[in-house]
Amino acid sequence: MEVYCLFMMRKKEKVITMTVTLILVVILICIKVTHFVIIERPLKQCRIVSAYHLTVNTNGAQIDQSWLFEKDDLTYIDIAKTFEQTYFVTDYAGGSSDSGALNELTIAFGETMDGMPDIRITVSENGYIQINGKRAYPLSLKYAGKRLYVHLLGCLQDGADLQQ
């Protein structure tokens, strides 16, 4: 009888351990899926619909490139969710390691009566995003700035490859 009780207790401990392990695995899978759906997937979407003016200045040579992004392409920038206008790139200042300048990409949202953008988001390669505009409080925040910067530059590069 004692042996049977010990056997049953060990079996019960194994069942509890397996249940706890299974619950932890399910939680980890849910976290990974949520991370992929909310963060990773939007970063991989990149559709360029039509051109706007963008000047890239590289060592004195100016290259005109410009692209209009569809609204859904940039909705993973939190503040962008409140705007219904199309987004367009207004400026890209390319820096080099020699000059110490930072690469910067500015995106404008909508346009006011005086031709100024409602909101400007500047993404720097140091990982900072600066947001300015009449309808937003100016702020600077450390975000997934590097990833966003690389993604947007990838969009521009994809567009340039498509045009050639």
Identify the residue ranges that each predicted region occupies.
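Function-determining sites in protein domains
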Residues: 10-164
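N-terminal Lys/Arg-rich, disordered targeting/topogenic segments
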Residues: 1-13
